[in-house]
């Protein structure tokens, strides 16, 4: 695989951006953060590190290590989904309860937008597993998942830029569209094997639209009324099963004899 041979350096560059973006709201008060936020942070960080390690291992032809690390998706991806689900419920609960002005204004919309990313991420990984014999498509689907984490990171960093308007909506829209532009550019480099990037570009454009047009109150109320840990457990188990069917495709119990 030569097309994405340096992708791991770009992935690793996201980690310090995450630290800067989430320092005020999470890392600076990590001791008082909720379990939901800890699981969410752990799942996201582990996934980025795994994606970087997978890119590096295959670029340096460490095929045995690449295959061994590949099995970690059955732990890290369900953890990512479980953490994302817990964070969604927490965000929705704050939005419904209007615990603070930010949650009251944006919590329901953000929960709706983030829910689509939590759903899309394991679907992209499943596509990567299902096409693991096609190196470029496999890599593109894996790398596309990393672009899903960019919008919330960029939305927290853009307001610190000189001259950027002091608007959370503008920061969110700019973050979404910047990530979509990156995904679209990567897709244009390879419109066949890189179709996962087109999916992410379309998703992030859709997220920009629903953030602006859909208040998300019904979604927030539904999430807030759902017990978080049973929901997160069910989501993690469903994710594991979905990945396993791509890793070990089901074979028919009865084989049809060839025509004579």
Language model features with spans:
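Alpha-helical membrane insertion/targeting regions
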Residues: 1-260
């Amino acid at each position: 695989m030569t097309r994405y041979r340096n992708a791991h350096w770009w992935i690793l560059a996201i980690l310090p951006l995450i630290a800067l973006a989430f320092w005020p709201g999470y890392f600076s008060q990590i001791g008082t953060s909720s379990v939901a936020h800890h699981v969410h942070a752990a799942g996201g960080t582990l996934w980025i590190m795994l994606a970087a390690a997978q890119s590096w291992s295959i670029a340096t032809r460490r095929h045995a290590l690449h295959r061994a690390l590949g099995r970690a998706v059955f732990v890290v991806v369900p953890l990512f989904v479980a953490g994302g689900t817990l964070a969604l419920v927490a965000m929705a609960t704050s939005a419904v309860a209007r615990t603070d002005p930010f949650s009251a204004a944006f919590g329901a919309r953000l929960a709706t937008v983030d829910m689509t990313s939590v759903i899309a991420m394991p679907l992209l990984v499943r596509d990567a597993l299902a096409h693991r014999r096609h190196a470029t498509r496999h890599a593109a689907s894996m790398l596309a998942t990393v672009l899903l984490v960019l919008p919330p990171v960029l939305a927290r960093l853009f307001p610190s830029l000189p001259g950027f308007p002091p608007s959370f909506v503008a920061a969110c829209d700019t973050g979404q569209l910047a990530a979509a532009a990156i995904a679209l550019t990567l897709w244009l480099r390879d419109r066949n094997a890189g179709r996962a990037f087109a999916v992410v570009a379309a998703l992030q454009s859709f997220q920009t639209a629903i953030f602006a047009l859909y208040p998300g109150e019904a979604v927030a109320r539904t999430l807030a009324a759902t017990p978080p840990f049973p929901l997160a457990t069910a989501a993690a188990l469903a994710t594991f099963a979905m990945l396993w069917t791509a890793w070990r495709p089901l074979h028919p119990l009865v084989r049809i004899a060839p025509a004579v």
